[in-house]
From Swiss-Prot:
InterPro entries: AB_hydrolase_1, AB_hydrolase_fold. It is found in: Cytoplasm; Membrane. Possible role in granule neuron development. The lineage of its organism: Eukaryota, Metazoa, Chordata, Craniata, Vertebrata. GO terms for molecular function: hydrolase activity. Keywords: Cytoplasm, Glycoprotein, Hydrolase, Membrane, Signal-anchor, Transmembrane, Transmembrane helix. Pfam families: Abhydrolase_6. The active site is at S142, D193, H220. Its EC number is 3.-.-.-. The gene is Abhd14a. One of its GO terms (cellular component) is membrane. Belongs to the AB hydrolase superfamily. ABHD14 family. Glycans are attached at N38. This is Protein ABHD14A. It comes from Rattus norvegicus (Rat).
Length: 242
């Protein structure tokens, strides 16, 4: 190769490099959901013999919307919903939201009173009463189904919405019991959850007023694997409640 050809080749490579550097890169994938003013997360303990630790956010704008209560799974606690940004997001969207530590988890002491189904129902009723929660939507993942399902069966008149996320304890109730519950329900589960999600979905489908959202490429804790998709589905459900 002559010096002239080598020079032309070098010039061509330089021009290609400069052109490449000037091209715009791929757009950053940022979420619009969490933007806005900062939100203060309050903490406290309920009254009574079984004191329950909770985290709470108030709506940044005064609304008359539903109030959302978050339970949690076996490996989690109320802090999960703060870390995920769920509490803060709902506050910005005009919702009051409360996340509780179930007995024996997080900052709540163990309690013998929740060893029975009736005791677990009474505990949730006490939380709603102590915190003066009304028009409540109950969000129940995994293990917390042992609290949420008996509460739904016995006290569904206290709920304006129910969001089960592959909960336990669905087998404890007959098809007719589910059919008697008219509470609007959003059934959420992860596509990759091949055990509890399928089992619970079989039973929860008997609820007469339900919709189903499957989060793709998400496992049992689908809200952790696909938080933005989870938040979008939850907000769409809440925003359309009467």
């Amino acid at each position: 190769m002559s010096r002239y050809q080598a020079a032309l080749l070098g010039l061509g490579l330089l021009l290609m490099f400069l052109l490449y550097m000037g091209l715009p890169g791929p757009p950053k994938q940022t979420s619009q959901l969490g933007r806005g003013p900062n939100v203060t997360v309050l903490t406290g303990l309920t009254r009574g013999s079984s004191q329950i630790f909770y985290r709470e956010v108030l709506p940044l704008q005064q609304t008359h919307r539903a109030e959302v209560v978050f339970l949690h799974g076996k490996a989690f606690n109320s802090h999960t919903w703060e870390q995920l940004g769920t509490l803060q997001l709902l506050s910005k969207r005009g919702y009051r939201a409360v996340a509780v530590d179930l007995p024996g988890f997080g900052n709540s002491a163990p309690s013998k009173e929740v060893s029975t189904e009736s005791g677990r129902v009474e505990l949730l009723e006490g939380v709603l009463r102590d915190l003066q929660l009304q028009n409540t939507v109950l969000v129940s993942p995994s293990l917390s189904g042992s609290y949420a399902l008996p509460f739904l069966m016995q006290s569904h008149h206290q709920l304006c919405g129910f969001v089960p996320i592959a909960p336990t304890s669905t087998r404890n109730y007959a098809q007719e019991q589910f059919q008697a519950v008219k509470t609007p329900t959003l059934i959420l589960y992860g596509e990759l959850d091949h055990t509890l999600a399928r089992e619970s979905l079989q039973q929860l489908r008997h609820l007469p007023n339900h919709s189903v959202v499957k989060l793709h490429n998400a496992g049992h804790a689908c809200y952790l694997h696909k938080p933005e998709a989870f938040h979008l589905a939850l907000l769409a459900f809440l925003d359309h409640l009467p």
